[in-house]
Amino acid sequence: MASNNHWFQSSQVPSFAQMLKKNLPVQPATKTITTPTGWSSESYGLSKMASKVTQVTGNFPEPLLSKNLSSISNPVLPPKKIPKEFIMKYKRGEINPVSALHQFAQMQRVQLDLKETVTTGNVMGPYFAFCAVVDGIQYKTGLGQNKKESRSNAAKLALDELLQLDEPEPRILETSGPPPFPAEPVVLSELAYVSKVHYEGRHIQYAKISQIVKERFNQLISNRSEYLKYSSSLAAFIIERAGQHEVVAIGTGEYNYSQDIKPDGRVLHDTHAVVTARRSLLRYFYRQLLLFYSKNPAMMEKSIFCTEPTSNLLTLKQNINICLYMNQLPKGSAQIKSQLRLNPHSISAFEANEELCLHVAVEGKIYLTVYCPKDGVNRISSMSSSDKLTRWEVLGVQGALLSHFIQPVYISSILIGDGNCSDTRGLEIAIKQRVDDALTSKLPMFYLVNRPHISLVPSAYPLQMNLEYKFLSLNWAQGDVSLEIVDGLSGKITESSPFKSGMSMASRLCKAAMLSRFNLLAKEAKKELLEAGTYHAAKCMSASYQEAKCKLKSYLQQHGYGSWIVKSPCIEQFNM
């Protein structure tokens, strides 16, 4: 592991000339996609592509679309020419992919089978896999969290290739900078391992989630109305199960600890909202795992986790999804200016590529890792929230310690309150375009490059600047009796916090608290993990997670995004 004293020297930011050279080949778009007012380009494109099903000839009822259903070819008759109207209807989403593929097979007089298969590569977990076999040729495998979704994805993959709808990727010049920034908003491809098909009504369902978050937070602060001032930065994790949504973790905050290093693990280093919410989510996971390991059938049934036949690790039960709501865009690359364009003769090309690089948070302010103040090497710094989101979309949100017990847990949907942004372009690029799907094949078993659905929703709370509460952070997880308030400057609980852990004033989200829960869970699970002498050792013993983390860091550096900062190892050399 690299020393913390050298991280700022190892980052490489491409020169302005390289940035301009890299973006010269970018060609103007040949088509313009017009979206309705109030919808992001992706939301509109996906809903049009996958949600509308009209009554057209050859549209098969869903119960008949089993894995054994096939279109019978007629070798005597010549194939029909594919009408342009058919292609346009499919591209507009007026025919769903499965129906469209069957119609294509009928017109071309070819045999079609939609067969259930196994997941490709090293992708394991609660995913169904289908592939289309057209005239004896097998096309790419489509995955989904249910059979309907995986069939649709498989049909779309086959049709896009048969109709030659896939446009070639623009050639990337080999420079040290990140990939070119798209000149105009585009409908991003969702042909990834875990693609999310946007069905009719999904946008309305997402809009309701922000209201659910608001109602839950209002309940938590019903007796302390002054806490409403924390709401501007609020982030929350929501469990979706059988169409029902439940808020399970909440965090607020816009600051991070940047003082001297404390080796006891009892200081909370990053109190930005989404980071605080994610650490609260970990506490929720620990409680759910204790339910499972209780061996009480009734309690095990309540747990969101279950056994995985192909592994000794637990996994989320089927039809359980995790959604993230953020009242505002996370700091870092997600806040890239929507108006930036790639005109190589303007400064915006440099700005766009620079903003896509990795960022570090120092006392709530954001810097490129290479430009971070030099005195930061003697203090604790954290990667930006945008960069941490990018990391979670590859490694999962569960972290190293919980990876001893469960498979990676990925976010299904990310919802952004529309109070301070009109589109999700920056977040789409930061999460979906900085890391290529090809990285999945290089990752350990169960890890993949996740592609969450991203959408704008009505803000749960208005954005407001309140200097009095600038440094304070609030956290809560399902099962907590009360809220906890942490001072981001000191990384400790405030005197006025409804919840206090004891004389040390350590937060229930700190590293020491997580290690304590880890030891308890290891005992309940009867796993020989207690031999780890320190927090750092327990993390390092999670071999697959550490391998995936190293591959992600190498990928980001090799593609010109900069180096992931490495904190001093002494902050993790503690035990209980």
Curated annotation (Swiss-Prot):
* Function comment: Required for male fertility and normal male germ cell differentiation. Plays a role in spermatogenesis. Binds to RNA but not to DNA.
The protein's superkingdom reads Eukaryota
Question: Does the record's keyword annotation contain Cytoplasm?
Answer: no
Gene Ontology terms, cellular component aspect? Answer: cytoplasm; male germ cell nucleus; nucleolus
Give the matching InterPro entries. Answer: A_deamin (IPR002466), ADAD1_DSRM (IPR044455), dsRBD_dom (IPR014720)
Which stretches make up the DRBM domain? 96-164
Q: Where in the cell is it found?
A: Nucleus
Family indicated by similarity = Belongs to the ADAD family.
- Tell me, in one coarse class, where this protein mainly resides: nucleus
Q: Which PROSITE patterns match?
A: A_DEAMIN_EDITASE, DS_RBD
Q: Under which name does UniProt file this protein?
A: Adenosine deaminase domain-containing protein 1
Gene3D superfamilies per the UniProt record, alphabetical = 3.30.160.20
Keyword Transmembrane helix set for record: no
The A to I editase domain sits at 249-574
| A molecular-function term among this protein's GO annotations | tRNA-specific adenosine deaminase activity
Q: Which UniProt keywords apply?
A: Developmental protein, Differentiation, Nucleus, RNA-binding, Spermatogenesis
**Could you tell me which Pfam families the record lists for this protein?**
A_deamin, dsrm
Q: Name one GO biological process term.
A: spermatid development
